[in-house]
Curated annotation (Swiss-Prot):
Enzyme Commission number, as recorded: 3.6.1.-
Reported cofactor(s): Zn(2+)
Xref: InterPro entries: G_CP_dom, NA-bd_OB-fold, P-loop_NTPase, Ribosome_biogen_GTPase_RsgA, RsgA_GTPase_dom, RsgA_N
Domain CP-type G, first and last residues per copy: 77-239
Enzyme class: hydrolase
GO biological process, one term: ribosomal small subunit biogenesis
Protein name, entry field: Small ribosomal subunit biogenesis GTPase RsgA
Assembly information from the UniProt record: Monomer. Associates with 30S ribosomal subunit, binds 16S rRNA.
Encoding gene per record: rsgA
Gene source species: Azobacteroides pseudotrichonymphae genomovar. CFP2
Cofactor annotation remark: Binds 1 zinc ion per subunit.
Length: 311
């Protein structure tokens, strides 16, 4: 029997079978013996084969080949990876410039990973109904920046019906990952798109202007009329890059990669090398300084954590 993994609550996985049934299954113990370094060898979005024992307990015996996946480091000091989701058609990064603040470093870390794994990513600047003039101007600056690089960006408010209808059109017929900090409004959007989802919603901390975790486990939710799936994920503070070599990082900054062939040295890291076309482009405002700061931030992070074997 074949199944699609739609939820993971620790040792149990909830699956939707090819017969349309919802069942719970465990992972067979021998998966732990295959040298897998990921904290979760089975992920939301995986297609798996299921076996049942004499007592009727379902076990996942095989993972089918993945079309793609998105991965992050499990924690700041970890040698392990955490697979966020697999077999995606696209990712929606939910961003807020206030209530709470999403940094450009967080945005760029996520975009580098989706570039590396060839997952089309759209940016949604949420809570625009709460923005003052300063917030709106800053959102417009970021939208101009990321649109110039090639990313689709949209200003939305989860309270507005027309914005939700627009998002719903983009979701049709696709498996979409929702990602972002706690408190940016992912669960509110999901609840409005899928009224029976009942994802928990909690206000942000007034003291720290940061979101508090409401979604505990990642979960795949079906849109009405079977028009697609959303994978809602727990909000996180940071995003650790995993499985990308130092020399590859600039490849996943399209704006930096555009100029790197013109550097004097083929292996230029765009830091202190002479005749660096990238640093010259920054001086001439062809590359945003915030993007370069993110690039250096990731470069230093990867330098300290040379862990590549994710599986």
């Amino acid at each position: 029997m074949k199944g699609l993994v739609i939820k993971n609550t620790g040792s149990w996985y909830q699956l939707k079978t090819d017969r349309g049934e919802l069942i719970k299954a465990k992972l067979k113990g021998n998966f732990r013996l295959k040298g897998i370094q990921s904290t979760n060898p089975i992920s939301i979005g995986d297609y798996v084969l299921i076996e049942k024992d004499l007592y009727g307990t379902a076990f996942i015996s095989t993972i089918e080949d993945r079309k793609n996946y998105i991965i992050r480091r499990a924690s700041n000091l970890s040698k392990q990876s955490h697979i966020i989701a697999t077999n995606l058609d696209q990712a929606f990064l939910i961003v807020t410039v206030n209530y709470p603040i999403t940094t450009t470093i967080f945005i760029d870390r996520f975009l580098v990973t989706t570039e590396a794994y060839r997952i089309p990513t759209l940016l949604f600047f949420n809570k625009t109904d709460l923005y003052n003039n300063h917030d709106m101007n800053y959102a417009d600056i970021l939208i101009h920046l990321y649109k110039s690089i090639g990313y689709s960006c949209y200003k939305i408010a989860a309270t507005k019906d027309e914005d939700l209808l627009f998002m719903e059109k983009l979701l049709r017929g696709k498996i979409t990952l929702f990602y972002g900090h706690s408190g940016v409004g992912k669960s509110t959007i999901v609840n409005r798109l899928i009224p029976n989802a009942k994802q928990k919603v909690q206000s942000i901390s007034k003291h720290h202007n940061k979101g508090m975790h409401t979604t505990t486990f990642s979960k795949m939710l079906e849109l009405p009329s079977s028009s697609g799936y959303i994978i809602d994920t727990p909000g996180i503070k940071g995003f650790g890059i995993f499985d990308i070599e130092k020399e590859e990082i600039s490849h996943y900054f399209p704006d930096i990669f555009r100029f790197s062939p013109y550097c004097k040295f083929y292996n230029c890291t765009h830091q202190k090398e002479p005749a660096c076309a990238v640093r010259e482009a920054i001086k001439n405002h062809y590359i945003s300084k915030s993007r370069y700061i993110s690039y250096i931030n990731i470069l230093e992070d990867v330098d300290m954590n040379k862990y590549r074997e994710a599986f």
